[in-house]
């Protein structure tokens, strides 16, 4: 991949647009973590500025690990935050000074750019949304699908985060400079220890549809008679609305006494959860990679996940875990 930028001995001014933010309660998962981990490693040689989405109580500007972070858009609610981010990030491309633009694409908060800026851009594609857009957000699903197709066809340099996602892209567009950049895990993922306890673990963003948590709860409700002492723990970031949905579904299924929804946890608590789990579940409907599956493997635990792009690369069937058909609760 040949990149636009300054001479080899000069720092490159990199503008990185990504709605996701590690501290964003609406959308702060593995994509945000990946972006920060890469950027902080580049910050000692280059000038990095990230434009991320706004949320309630967020500082407008801050610097982390040498990376400038600007939060733009409305913090009123999630839809307003997404929409206003698209408008202001698109406008920022006209005023910001940069040599290279890294664009983490999201069909629900696209950034519009002219040909000049597209020519100095690397488009990073985490996953192909396709028909899931209509199921997840019916009101904006069709525009999201069209935006995804248009974006794939409009940029020449693309990065995918798993072989299966790159294959999905190849089926939709041709003649692109496609590159694969995996997502790694921290050393702490290998340092997990502790006795195995009595629970199954889900760790990740508490997004009911995307992560298939409704399927997980329904499947868990079926093992009550055969494994009455086994618990299910859900840990990760999520809005009050999403957590409420999961609590309601648990009650409807009659498993509320065996399901614990922790919400966000510290790194130390995360390691303890991984160390004590019987195994981890990832029943996602779509993924780009599945960093939690790699973290689970590093901790020496098995993963049960869905046979979808991303997870088919992150989980080796019958070696590091099991792959099941999507939507399956049997």
Task: Annotate the PLM regions.
Residues 293, 302-305:
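Short hydrophobic beta-strand element within catalytic cores of glycosyltransferases
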């Amino acid at each position: 991949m040949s990149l636009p930028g300054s001479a080899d001995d000069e720092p490159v001014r990199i503008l990185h647009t990504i709605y996701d933010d590690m501290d964003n309660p609406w959308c702060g998962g593995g994509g945000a973590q990946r972006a920060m981990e890469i950027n902080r490693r580049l910050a000692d040689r280059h000038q990095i500025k990230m434009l991320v989405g706004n949320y309630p109580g967020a500082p407008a500007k801050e610097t982390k690990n040498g990376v400038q972070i600007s939060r733009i858009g409305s913090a009123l609610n999630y839809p307003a935050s997404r929409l206003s981010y698209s408008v202001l990030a698109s406008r920022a491309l006209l005023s910001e000074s940069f040599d290279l633009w890294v664009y983490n694409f999201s069909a629900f908060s696209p950034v519009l750019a002219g040909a000049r800026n597209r020519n100095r851009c690397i488009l990073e594609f985490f996953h192909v949304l396709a028909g899931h857009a209509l199921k997840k957000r019916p009101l904006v699903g069709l525009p999201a699908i069209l935006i995804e197709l248009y974006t794939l066809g409009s940029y020449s340099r693309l990065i995918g985060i798993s072989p299966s996602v790159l294959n999905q892209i190849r089926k939709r567009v041709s003649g692109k400079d496609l590159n694969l950049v995996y997502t790694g895990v921290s050393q702490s993922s290998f340092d997990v220890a502790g006795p195995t306890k009595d629970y199954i673990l889900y760790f990740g963003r508490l997004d009911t549809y995307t992560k298939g948590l409704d399927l997980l709860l329904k499947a868990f409700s079926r093992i009550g008679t055969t494994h009455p002492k086994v618990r299910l723990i859900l840990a990760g970031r999520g809005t009050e609305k999403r957590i409420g949905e999961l609590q309601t579904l648990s009650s409807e299924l009659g498993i509320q006494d065996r399901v614990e929804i922790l919400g966000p946890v510290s790194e130390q608590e995360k390691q303890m959860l991984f160390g004590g789990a019987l195994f981890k579940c990832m029943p996602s409907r779509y993924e780009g990679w599945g960093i939690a599956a790699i973290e689970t493997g590093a901790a020496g635990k098995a993963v049960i996940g869905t046979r979808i792009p991303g997870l088919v690369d992150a989980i080796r069937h019958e070696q590091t875990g099991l792959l099941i058909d999507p939507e399956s609760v049997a």
